Amino acid sequence: MEQGSQISSSIQSLTKDKEIRYTDEELIIRFQYGDEQAFVELVNRYRNRLMTFVCGYVFDIDKAEDLVQDTFVKLYTKKDSYKPIAKFSTWIYTIAGNLAKTELRKRKRRPEYTFTQLGSNEWEFTLPAAEPETGETVEDHLLMKQIYKAIQVLPEQSRIVVILRDMQELTYKEISMIVDVPLGTVKSRINRARLKIQQALEEFR
């Protein structure tokens, strides 16, 4: 009877957990206390976002996948280093960004990659579907593809901040902490990036 009661309590707990939408900060704290499912949820939330972010540095999907995997390994093994004084998103993006920068330093004496060399398929995962989604016009679909292409050819410093702001929807303050530059610099880089994107779109039209 006691065992049946324990099982019932566990099922109720699991059902309740599924109904609750935990914040990232609540999930990492739950993970710190041993909740493995909280780790899985964080991975699910951030896998694609980090792929887009890291690819903005390395322009190589295979390498980006490796770096994102390394980011989650660090999340798993260094979970206790997270302190609730910072947002989880800032913390995880900083880890991923540092790993990407380390990879770039390793490439210093290797031939540099360019968007042309990699080909458009390297970034296909960030682009809209091959066919317009329901309710989306062909014109809107093509416009979105042009926006992504314009972002891809921006200088790295501009590309990263505009990805974080306009694609990942992070705040200016979060971006400043992640890329480790003053808030004013972040804003000016984003403004310049948006201007270049606008110019590219005008040429497209």
Language-model segment annotations:
Residues 52, 66-73, 86-98:
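Structural recognition of an alpha-helix C-terminal capping motif at a helix-to-coil junction
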Residues 32-33, 72-87, 107:
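Sigma70-family region 2
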Residues 16, 32-41, 51-70, 183, ...:
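Short, charged helix-capping/linker segments at alpha-helix termini
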Residues 80-84, 94-115, 192:
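Arg/Lys-rich amphipathic alpha helix in sigma70-family domain 2
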Residues 104-127, 138:
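Short, basic/polar amphipathic helix motif occurring as a linker/hinge flanking DNA-binding modules
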Residues 54, 105-108, 154, 159, ...:
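Short, Lys/Arg-enriched C-terminal cap helix and immediately downstream tail that follows
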Residues 1-29, 119-131, 135, 145-157, ...:
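Intrinsic, short, N-terminal disordered tails of RNA polymerase sigma-factor systems
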Residues 161-165:
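A short pre-motif secondary-structure segment
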